[in-house]
C-alpha cells in the first residue's frame, strides 16, 4: 500500500491517522471536487503501465515468426485471452463472446490497480470508493442490459407485485420496493467488497508500520528510534505486503470479475428458462389440440 495513503497524527500536529479521502465525508464544507487526489495519479500510472504492456505485446506479436516458438510474454498473454474467451462462452454463452475484451481488460486493470500500491508514493485506485463504485456501476448497467435482452418485459414485471389466480401468476402495476432494493444490492455489494478489502489492508499495514516506531519511541535518541523502527518495519513488513498487495489484490480482482460474470449469467439464465417454459407450454397446447381433433 502507498505510504502516502498511510498518514498518522501525533499531538504535536504530525499526521498519524489515515484521513485523506477515507474519513473526510463532509460533502458541503470540506468537499473539493476539482482537487485531484492521490488515487487520480494512481489511475494515470495504471493507464501508462497497461498501455506499455499492450504496446510491447503488439510489437512482439508482429515480429514473431509463426514457424518458431513465441516468447514467454506473448504465450502468457495469449493464454490469458483464451482463458477469458472460454470463461465468457461458458458462463454467459457463445453469443456473448464479444464481451471477452471487456472482462480481460477489467481483470488486468483491477490487478494492476491493486499491485500499483507496491510502488512507493502511489495510492492504489481501488482504495477510493469512487473508483470501485464506478466499476460496480458498469457491472450494474450490464445486469440491466442482460435482463432486458433475455427477459424482455418479464424483467420489468419483476419489479412489481405478482398475484396468483388459479395457479397462474399475474403482474400488477404496483411497484415492489423490495425488488428494487434487491436489484441494486449487487451494485453496493461488489463495490464495497473490493474497496473494503483494499482499504483494510492499507489500515493494517499502517498500524504495523507505526507499531515499530512507537515501540522505539521511548528511546531518548529520536533519530535512533526512527532508524530502528524503519529497520524492523522494513524487515518484517515484506511478507505482509506480499499478502495484502499481491495475494489479496490479485484475488479481489479475480473475484470482482467472476461476480460480474455470475450476475450477468443469472439474468441470461432466467430469460432462457422463461423462454423454455413458454415453448413447453406452447408445445403442450398444440399436443392437446391434436388430441381433441
UniProtKB/Swiss-Prot annotation:
GO CC list: plasma membrane; proton-transporting ATP synthase complex
GO molecular function terms noted in the UniProt entry: proton-transporting ATP synthase activity, rotational mechanism
SUPFAM superfamilies: F1F0 ATP synthase subunit A
Membrane topology label: Multi-pass membrane protein
Location, primary (coarse class): membrane
Biological process, per Gene Ontology: proton motive force-driven plasma membrane ATP synthesis
Localization per record: Cell membrane
Residues that span the membrane, as ranges: 39-59, 73-93, 102-122, 128-148, 172-192, 198-218, 224-244, 245-265
Keywords: ATP synthesis, Cell membrane, CF(0), Hydrogen ion transport, Ion transport, Membrane, Transmembrane, Transmembrane helix, Transport
A Pfam family annotated for this UniProt entry: ATP-synt_A
Similarity annotation: Belongs to the ATPase A chain family.
PANTHER family: ATP SYNTHASE SUBUNIT A, CHLOROPLASTIC
Subunit structure: F-type ATPases have 2 components, CF(1) - the catalytic core - and CF(0) - the membrane proton channel. CF(1) has five subunits: alpha(3), beta(3), gamma(1), delta(1), epsilon(1). CF(0) has three main subunits: a(1), b(2) and c(9-12). The alpha and beta chains form an alternating ring which encloses part of the gamma chain. CF(1) is attached to CF(0) by a central stalk formed by the gamma and epsilon chains, while a peripheral stalk is formed by the delta and b chains.
Job of this protein: Key component of the proton channel; it plays a direct role in the translocation of protons across the membrane.
Record protein name field: ATP synthase subunit a
Organism encoding this protein: Mycoplasma pneumoniae (strain ATCC 29342 / M129 / Subtype 1)
